[in-house]
């Protein structure tokens, strides 16, 4: 047996012994009738204590004679005879406990506390003081076991090293990894910040169906489910767009929704089949208004959450404080592939030749607009590090966007890129019911030709447009990718609490 295998076997034996010992301790607690109490009430979290009292000297704390009650998980313990120091972790961070035998009721220190394990959840009451090293601590006069942990924590020095385990057992990741906890706190702040920003601009938050008879609003492969009561196949939504625009038809002129979308596609550092989007629709506005709104949203969130408009992402600094760059799709192709003859992008055969020369397999169902878009994605997208708006998307790849008044082959649409990734997509909405019907027919033809991401024909949505959709602009922003930027995370799994994983066999 190799040394590595021997160490692994020893680790399994040690774990089994640990589990056995902890269960025996729980059995003893059950016999004493003191297991899993639910009557302890704390009055402070660790961050509240640090914020209020870190700046005070020990003499001042003694004079104030402040008694507090805290609760949390025991992360470390140093037993030094008749006294011990404990690190207690709660939602706000960590606080140190000073536990002395003679300051607790008789028997608690030796017969209870010393038999508890790391990972156990404790309740503690006592008075605040500072140690000789200046660390804010609680001198305990009451200590109770609230929850017995039957499994040990990850190694305190190395944390949870197995990346797969971090995602599968997120609870362990959150216990042992400060960075992960902070990531999801920032995520929550971003969601709250978006909602406040939108409400301040007069938008109403709404909810639309997650299960749909016809999936629409994006080019993607849907998940299929079955509604037993209706005996009807349904689809998990790929986007809420068409329902939100129905609401604008109905008179709700500014609406937004933050919720999940589902796309039955590949998994990568940027893609999870279940992801969170914010979509908004604003009547009597165009895509240029959304460009201003998007810039303001990112600038506001950065300032409010991070306290600055410069955000570190990898080895670059993203600047949300200055105006974002704006390029047309063709300008971006030319910028990052200077040898491109712009006239070639107006000719199907020439554009196809360019695409094939850079390794793109051109499908038979693609038209010129799709080919130009694929060229852009291949040669330019990865270079769009600083916040950049790309405009003038071909109508062929924008079946829901309004055609440009001057050039009907392109649409009044933009996509928003940061860090080489698409973060958002917005456009002036197509409100011509007849044009929309024809574009749906074009999508049906593309689907019949083998494009399984082409859209379905949504007759009810066309009917809604026939009742009149005001001039409207719509925007969708990927929340997960936004959180990646704000937390310097480089895989989407790091910002989704429970990402999609293949089951362990």
Curated annotation (Swiss-Prot):
It is an enzyme of class 6 (ligase). Its cofactor is Mg(2+). Keywords: Aminoacyl-tRNA synthetase, ATP-binding, Cytoplasm, Ligase, Magnesium, Metal-binding, Nucleotide-binding, Protein biosynthesis. Mg(2+) 2 binds at residue 422. The keyword ATP-binding applies. Mg(2+) 1 binds at residues 415, 422. CDD domains: LysRS_core, LysRS_N. The keyword Methyltransferase does not apply. Binds 3 Mg(2+) ions per subunit. InterPro entries: Aa-tRNA-synt_II, aa-tRNA-synth_II, aa-tRNA-synth_II/BPL/LPL, Lys-tRNA-ligase_II, Lys-tRNA-ligase_II_bac/euk, Lys-tRNA-ligase_II_N, Lys-tRNA-synth_II_C, NA-bd_OB-fold. One of its GO terms (biological process) is lysyl-tRNA aminoacylation. Coiled coil: none annotated. One of its GO terms (cellular component) is cytosol. Homodimer. This is Lysine--tRNA ligase. The lineage of its organism: Bacteria, Pseudomonadati, Pseudomonadota, Gammaproteobacteria, Enterobacterales.
């Amino acid at each position: 047996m190799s040394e590595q295998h021997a160490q692994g076997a020893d680790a399994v034996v040690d774990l089994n012994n640990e589990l056995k010992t902890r269960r025996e301790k729980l059995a003893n607690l059950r016999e004493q009738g003191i297991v899993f109490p639910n009557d302890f009430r704390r009055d402070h979290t660790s961050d509240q204590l640090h914020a209020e009292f870190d700046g005070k000297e020990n003499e001042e704390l003694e004079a104030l004679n402040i008694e507090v009650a805290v609760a949390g998980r025991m992360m470390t313990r140093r037993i030094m005879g008749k006294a011990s120091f404990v690190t207690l972790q709660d939602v706000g961070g960590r606080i140190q406990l000073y536990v002395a035998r003679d300051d607790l009721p008789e028997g608690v220190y030796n017969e209870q506390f010393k038999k508890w394990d790391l990972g156990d959840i404790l309740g503690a009451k006592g008075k605040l003081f500072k140690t000789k090293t200046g660390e804010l601590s609680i001198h305990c006069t009451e200590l109770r076991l609230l929850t017995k942990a039957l499994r040990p924590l990850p190694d305190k020095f190395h944390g949870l090293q197995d990346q797969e385990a971090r995602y599968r057992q997120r609870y362990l990741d959150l216990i042992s990894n400060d960075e992960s906890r902070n990531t999801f706190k920032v995520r929550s702040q971003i969601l709250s910040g978006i909602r406040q920003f939108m409400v301040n601009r007069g938008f109403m938050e709404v909810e639309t169906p997650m299960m749909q008879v016809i999936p629409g609003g994006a080019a993607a492969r849907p998940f299929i489910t079955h509604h037993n009561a209706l005996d009807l196949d349904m689809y998990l939504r790929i986007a809420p767009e068409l329902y939100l625009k129905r609401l604008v038809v109905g008179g709700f002129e500014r609406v937004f929704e933050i919720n999940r979308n589902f796309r039955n596609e590949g998994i990568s550092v940027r893609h999870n089949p279940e992801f969170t989007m914010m979509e908004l629709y604003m009547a009597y506005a165009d895509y240029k208004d959304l460009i201003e709104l998007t810039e303001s949203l990112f600038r506001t969130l950065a300032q409010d959450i991070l306290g600055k408009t410069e955000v570190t992402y990898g080895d670059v600094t993203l600047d949300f404080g200055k105006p974002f760059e704006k390029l047309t799709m063709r300008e971006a192709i030319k910028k990052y592939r200077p040898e491109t003859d712009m006239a070639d992008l107006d000719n199907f055969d020439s554009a196809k030749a360019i695409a094939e020369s850079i390794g793109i397999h051109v499908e038979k169902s693609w038209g010129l607009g799709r080919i130009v878009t694929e060229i852009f994605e291949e040669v330019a997208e990865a270079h769009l590090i600083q916040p950049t708006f790309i405009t003038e998307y071909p109508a062929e790849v924008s079946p829901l966007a309004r055609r440009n008044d001057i050039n009907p082959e392109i649409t009044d649409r933009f996509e928003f890129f940061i860090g080489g990734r698409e973060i958002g997509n917005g456009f002036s909405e197509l409100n011509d019911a007849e044009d929309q019907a024809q574009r749906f027919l074009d999508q049906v033809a593309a689907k019949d030709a083998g494009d399984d991401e082409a859209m379905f024909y949504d007759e009810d949505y066309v009917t809604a447009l026939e009742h009149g959709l005001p001039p409207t602009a719509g925007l969708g922003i990927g929340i997960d990718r936004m959180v990646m930027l704000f937390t310097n995370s480089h895989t989407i799994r790091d910002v989704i609490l429970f990402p999609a994983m293949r089951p362990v066999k």
